[in-house]
Amino acid sequence: MTQDELKKAVGWAALEYVKPGTIVGVGTGSTASHFIDALATMKGQIEGAVSSSEASTAKLKSYGIPVFDCNEVDSLDIYVDGADEINHQMQMIKGGGAALTREKIIAAVAKTFVCIVDESKQVDVLGKFPLPVEVIPMARSYVARELVKLGGLPEYRENVVTDNGNVILDVYNLTILNPIELENKINSIAGVVTVGLFANRGADIVLMGTSEGVKTIK
């Protein structure tokens, strides 16, 4: 199977966790896009969705799936999204698509976070994929200097503005042995909106596309 076929397989496999009558948290990216395709087959059975990006919102609406503001819901039964990297503790790096802050908010609201990935995303230690950090524009240089102190090599992601009007620094050269500690440290830097480490709130279920089929990890 190609990588895209693996992504499609896990996107459709996630439908098993969607309960009729609920509002579904929906992520962003190529794998989440396959999940939206699958979710469209249940559009008459679910109340709607909360989306982590303008791109996902547009796709959901194109299928006629109602999209709610996160402030309109008290809780979400499920949140389905991909990851750029995931370790064996189900902690992740996310934010390659620059939607990390909204993704983190929806993950916090959701009772169950189902992460859908192909097997190339699994790693023993996080950090090979550059770690995205969403930053208030005026703090960009200061935050970059602070990230260097943590051993990182931050790079400004040019021509990218997040849906929240902020900028992204991608941090290279990190071997993340303690993801929770690093998440807390980076989040405490003035001017950081959030870091793309999902360690304090990791995944509850991982659906991993492999050459042998979809593997479920809980």
Curated annotation (Swiss-Prot):
Q: In which pathway does it act?
A: Carbohydrate degradation; pentose phosphate pathway; D-ribose 5-phosphate from D-ribulose 5-phosphate (non-oxidative stage): step 1/1
Presence of the UniProt keyword Isomerase in the record: yes
Q: Which domain of life is it from?
A: Bacteria
- Class in the EC hierarchy, top level: isomerase
Could you say which EC number(s) this protein's record lists? 5.3.1.6
Q: Which UniProt keywords apply?
A: Isomerase
Q: Which GO terms describe its molecular function?
A: ribose-5-phosphate isomerase activity
Which transformation does this protein catalyse, written as a reaction? Answer: aldehydo-D-ribose 5-phosphate = D-ribulose 5-phosphate
Q: Where is the signal peptide?
A: none
UniProt cross-references to Pfam families, sorted A to Z:
Rib_5-P_isom_A
| A GO BP entry | D-ribose metabolic process
A GO CC term?
cytosol
Catalytic residues as annotated in Swiss-Prot or TrEMBL: 103
| Residues that coordinate or bind substrate | 28-31, 81-84, 94-97, 121
Which Gene3D superfamilies does the entry link to?
3.30.70.260, 3.40.50.1360
Q: Does the keyword Isomerase apply?
A: yes
Q: How does it assemble?
A: Homodimer.
By sequence similarity, the record places it as follows:
Belongs to the ribose 5-phosphate isomerase family.
Q: What does this protein do?
A: Catalyzes the reversible conversion of ribose-5-phosphate to ribulose 5-phosphate.
How is this protein named in the record?
Ribose-5-phosphate isomerase A
What broad taxonomic lineage does this protein's source fall under? Bacteria, Pseudomonadati, Pseudomonadota, Gammaproteobacteria, Enterobacterales
**Gene coding for it:** rpiA
